[in-house]
């Protein structure tokens, strides 16, 4: 008796995986490398993470201090604006909720800007990084995050297009207004919801 191959499991009748947002395709085991700048080489011992702006207690964590916080794991899907999706993948780090509890956002804080060591920036509404929706991560599939994918640590906001998950993140600044980042100033959507195909301004 023949046995179905792996590729025939979990397909819906329409032939499209329901985990894929409109216009996306499953990249399988690949993890494409896309970046807006030269990939930096950052030693974990010299890396820090700062949360400042509209918070009661601005804070900077060292690599060891961040690792001493309760770990948090994400298992799910990520979606790139260039139309690839990576399904059933995993990252581990610390929930942004944990960092916000320590820094205590002020009542007027509505948005944030994430900044990378390269100077890359991206903006996010504060509500989109709370309640278990965002992380600072340093492992992927159980291995240290490669530098081409943002290592030693990157922001992870998996429910939005992946340019919002800033590589080599080193600072998150809370604001009382929206302040577009690098790609947002160059025509990309301010939010970037893949299920609404918010790739570009006006989408």
Please provide the spans of the model-predicted regions.
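Structured, non-membrane catalytic/scaffold regions adjacent to prosthetic-group chemistry
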Residues: 2-203
């Amino acid at each position: 008796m023949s046995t179905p191959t792996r590729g025939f499991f979990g397909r819906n009748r329409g032939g499209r995986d329901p985990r894929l947002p409109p216009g996306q395709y499953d990249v399988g085991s690949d993890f494409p490398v896309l970046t807006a700048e030269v990939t930096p080489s950052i030693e974990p011992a010299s890396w820090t993470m700062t949360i400042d702006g509209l918070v009661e207690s601005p804070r900077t964590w060292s690599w060891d201090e961040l690792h001493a916080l309760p770990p948090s794991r994400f298992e799910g899907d990520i979606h790139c604006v260039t139309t690839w999706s990576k399904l059933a993948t995993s990252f581990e780090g610390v929930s942004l909720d944990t960092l916000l509890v320590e820094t205590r956002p002020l009542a007027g804080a509505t948005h944030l800007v994430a900044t990378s060591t390269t100077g890359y920036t991206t903006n996010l509404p504060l509500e989109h990084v709370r309640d278990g929706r965002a992380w600072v991560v340093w492992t992927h599939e159980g291995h240290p995050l490669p530098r081409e994918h943002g290592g030693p640590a990157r922001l992870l906001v998996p429910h939005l297009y992946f340019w919002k998950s800033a590589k080599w993140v080193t600072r998150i600044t809370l604001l009382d207004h929206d302040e577009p980042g690098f790609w947002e100033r160059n025509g990309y959507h301010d939010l970037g919801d893949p299920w609404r195909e918010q790739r570009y301004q006006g989408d």
